[in-house]
Swiss-Prot record:
This is Sporulation protein YpeB. Coiled coil: none annotated. Keywords: Germination, Sporulation. Required for spore cortex hydrolysis during germination. Appears to be required for either expression, localization, activation or function of SleB. Belongs to the YpeB family. It comes from the Bacteria. InterPro entries: PepSY, YpeB_N, YpeB_PepSY1-2.
């Protein structure tokens, strides 16, 4: 009798232990999947931001307008901050990557200090222009090396969790493609010889990367490839490489890339709805045949093909025969700054060369926009009378607390300087004043 009782107790214990062990394994596996997805996201964003950084530095070199150069430097500074943040989220603690981080800090420090000074009174010196050219060449080299690592990683399905293991084993490091690639990047930066130990490290902020407002049904891998072929205008599916984020990802994605002769492309596509979130095509530009205005019409058509309707052109620029267009969502006449997208169009043939819809899909939603409690004239009364107002719009912006507020947006000129002024449409308070050389005014002296 006691024998059968003992057997029963032991059986229950064994089963209980097995269940506990399985649950422990499942939890650890979920954690690993989540970590792998975060590493993948950070790496692909780092590669993407390095592409943009190189492009924006090239844009700055091509500019001839001091008024537009300062905001361009602010954009470059922000990109270095974002790239720096992504580096910090990769498992590179055991891999010397300090010089690359310092390189990003140097660019950020240089562009920030340049952006906040008056370039009319103190324009770029020949030495500073040469430094900017050096940054352009060097960032281009890093961009190409990261793209090569990315291509191999996607082709071979490499995992970042393996990088962590390799970094703790000197022998394994020699056989890890990702580790070797980052060591190549670090050696390249070391050869630049420009790191300045006195420069401060750029502070970074953690951002919410969840895409809460994606719509549509989930697309299969084959459907994603077909969609990518249409977007990239590629007829041979075998040219495309695709990888899928793990099940633990906050936002399941397909990462799709291709290399064709001297042309390279990369895209992040949301599994839900098949929406392209980031897209970049790099190729040699030919003779310009499309005007900047014609390019904006093509950009709007591209947005419509992706289901992004009611978008209003906010600003545009041109460099190296590429048109860069920023659009805001127009909600029944109200410009929504958080629902912004950027499109790049080749002005040689009108091809789509770049797309960023992150902000749109992170923020876009059906809003119940209240009626303004003050009139536009009352809002104008809260703007300095010496400001010559040129344009006005209703706009939704984020205030200092990160909350969306309805405002009257005024574009005006004072002392030959252009300002964008946002007045709260409920209480008439000033929410934000921007000087359009990129410097934000944080005080009320213009009121």
């Amino acid at each position: 009798m006691f024998r059968w009782i003992a057997i029963g107790v032991l059986s229950v214990a064994v089963i209980g232990t097995a269940v506990w062990g399985y649950n422990e394994y499942s939890e650890k596996n979920e954690i690993k999947i989540q970590a792998e997805n975060e590493y993948q996201r950070s790496f692909h964003e780092l590669t993407y931001y390095m592409d943009l950084l190189n492009d924006e530095i090239g844009t700055a070199l091509a500019m001839n307008s001091k008024e537009r150069l300062s905001p361009q430097f602010v954009d470059i500074w922000r990109l270095t901050s974002q790239a720096h943040s992504n580096v910090g989220q990769l498992p590179l603690g055991l891999l010397p990557f300090h010089k690359t981080e310092q390189f990003l800090s140097d660019i950020g420090e240089f562009t920030y200090q340049t952006a906040v000074r008056n370039l009319d009174d103190n324009p770029l010196t020949e030495e500073e222009t040469q430094k900017l050219k050096d940054y352009y060449d060097q960032s281009g080299q890093i961009k190409d090396e990261l793209r090569q690592v990315q291509h191999v990683a996607l082709e071979e399905g490499l995992n970042w969790m393996d990088v962590e293991l390799a970094l703790s084993d000197e022998n394994a490091q020699q056989d890890n493609t990702i580790v070797n690639g980052f060591q190549t990047v670090e050696k390249s930066v070391e050869g630049f010889g420009q790191a300045d130990p006195e420069n401060s490290t750029i502070s970074t902020n953690t951002q919410d990367h969840s895409y809460k407002n994606l719509t549509g049904s989930e697309v299969t891998e084959n459907e994603a490839l077909q969609r990518a072929m249409e977007i990239f205008e590629i007829k041979d599916k075998d040219l495309l490489s695709i990888s899928k984020s793990g099940e633990g990802a906050d936002t399941p994605l397909y990462s799709i890339s291709y290399n064709k002769d001297e042309e390279h492309g990369y895209m992040d596509m949301a599994i839900k709805g098949g929406h392209p979130l980031n897209l970049l095509v790099s190729r040699e530009m030919k003779e310009k045949k499309v005007s900047l205005n014609e390019g904006s019409e093509k950009a709007k058509d591209y947005l419509a093909s992706f289901g992004l309707e009611d978008m209003t052109l906010f600003q545009s620029s041109e460099y190296d025969h590429i048109g860069v267009y920023s659009y805001l969502y127009n909600d029944n006449g109200v410009r929504v700054y958080s629902d912004a997208v950027e499109v790049k169009v080749g002005l040689d043939n009108g091809d789509l060369l770049g797309l960023t819809t992150n902000s749109y899909f992170m923020n876009h939603t059906d809003r119940e926009i209240p009626e303004p409690k003050i009139s536009e004239d009352e809002a104008r009364d809260n703007v300095n009378s010496t400001v010559d107002i040129q344009e006005s719009h209703l706009a939704i912006i984020d205030n200092n607390a990160g909350e969306e507020v309805l405002t009257y947006e005024f574009l005006g000129i004072m002392d030959d300087e252009t300002y964008r002024i946002f007045i709260n449409a409920e209480n008439g308070q000033e929410e934000l004043v921007e000087k359009l050389d990129g410097k934000e005014v944080n005080y009320n002296s213009v009121l």
